[in-house]
């Protein structure tokens, strides 16, 4: 169900779109279920019809390109389509049962005229279960060739556009085209989705803001995303002008997948540095708390399709070509490279490394050949042309220097190579060399291992001898961590690469066999089907609680996100609390200080005149017992709040308590051994000196290490380490080590805001003035103790009448409190309303403006 606030934002938001001529959104219209046609041009606030009754499990796979091959029939002039068996989107079906229905959304690799689009759409849906997204030629070029290939692709591969030859500078029009294209994809998904049952799986960096459009329309959509390219470090990514929009787009998913932990770590670091989000690992699953939703992170490299490779290996043409290659290079060691003509594949570095190999090991001349198959470039530009020129020049230089009339150490194959021929080279090669300087995954090593294993029907590959293989792979490619038996190299260190190739070539047969068996076992058990099934299982787990929470849609445009909270969690309003406040005679009010009455700040810490005025108004009512419960020291709080004579203060989390300004400070804690301070201070000081932007606060009862002004990642990392360090050092001391919001605190055992609130309520009961209403407001972890303690205390049988309790957190976030207020301004508005109510016989109409938000 779509929340009303979300639906309202659909009309209010202003998307960053370009005005491209497009096919009307309702043409072609697509049947999702017999007899039901969805029409996204209708009222966006209307309910979505659920068709789950007779539908089977369905996955919607959204990618830039459909897994189809297209051509026009020469005789009829009609378009003909067939499955692209090499497409990952098609191969991932192997991970699911035959009962699972797949629907594909994406573009075709050909341009379809506008007057043919409806006919083609119906044909694709009926025959292939595919939904085509038709982009105009101009939009396609700006979206794919422009933003994707000339801005995102270089940046994600660590190339900054500092010079014209290093990627294009950011172009706002290309970004608008990217957003426009993603919007068209979302329109097509909306036409066919059954949001209550379908799972949507988005593939790769072309569609990183698509989740925002879908989440905006369907708050509880089941949405996964997998990034097939690297994700750069935060220092690189933060240079992107639209960095926040893309991060928020990805965070509108339920599950985000990466090939390696490095890529995931960089993404998490960006979320921490740019959006202030923390993550944690529970039972092996990494999760980001994002406005009440947990966005899970999946780390699993994609695999190959074993059946596809083995079927090609079994072909007679493959066997014949394998024998031909073996005969051609008889008596020589064959090193194989298969790469796209791309500046990131490191082909020229590979050739230079081979040149160093021949320079260093002269005896290998005439005995080693590198066959480099060059796949066509996926994009064009000066950098691709330069890479191609350098590759040919380097190969020619090596062949002229080390070759003979009947021997070429470098064999360049720069043409469209049939699949059977590539497979034959894989099967015949003694060593596979992958030298990319940056690559998302790269499945060449996997294919090489499978082809070296062979099949029983391929007599050219399979005989009675053990299977062997050797791999030299770059440490900068996604498959490297999975290949523990490979020789990993830094592609920039050509001497080390040359040495690695030499080591691979002279490796013993036994060692080659052991390494091969280890690789083949992993690859055969972690194929593309395993990858897809594992991802979908995690996505189902991530979406399990979708309907147990209520949703708010907040934010405009690409800043949209969904706030997901408990059904009982609601905003506390003046209108709701004033009637209870007025009918009760004794009230206890507990207020946090930082982040509740005043904003969190390391600079301005004293309260404003308005805060003091509101507190004075509350304290002047003799029926109110008002306490500030804070972690700050008693001296600071006394000075700041001195005008409020009847205000109670529980300083240092309740270690010191004073009921009124003229009363003496009291503590219920016996003086503890303070030797622990001499143990803690040197540790904290050491971390402070090592971590720029941190400080130590010396309290009478505690020591606090603050890292609010430190680098977010480094400060958080240091806080975790110091927590472990101090817990170990203080294991036998009567103190506890607590981590709070940007702090690590060491304090005596049994000191907490919850216990302080309990003490106040207990003393009110003993005085014969049990509270009839209790309100507590706070914003951080320490206040959760107060909420929990008060909620349990008020059920005490000593209280003859159970008081009304209003536990309220500041900020819409998961909490033990039942209510929330948005910020400090909201808190003051509420307190001002209560103060005015104390001095008036009737509720003031000017303070009944805030009401419960409508939640659907």
Swiss-Prot record:
Keywords: Glycosyltransferase, Phosphoprotein, Transferase. InterPro entries: Glyco_trans_20, HAD-like_sf, HAD-SF_hydro_IIB, HAD_sf, Trehalose_PPase. Expressed in leaves, roots, stems and flowers. The modification Phosphothreonine is found at residue 32. Residues 57-541 are annotated as: Glycosyltransferase. Gene3D superfamilies: Glycogen Phosphorylase B (3.40.50.2000), HAD superfamily/HAD-like (3.40.50.1000). The modification Phosphoserine is found at residue 5. NCBIfam families: HAD-SF-IIB, T6PP. This is Probable alpha,alpha-trehalose-phosphate synthase [UDP-forming] 8. It comes from Arabidopsis thaliana. The lineage of its organism: Eukaryota, Viridiplantae, Streptophyta, Embryophyta, Tracheophyta. The gene is TPS8.
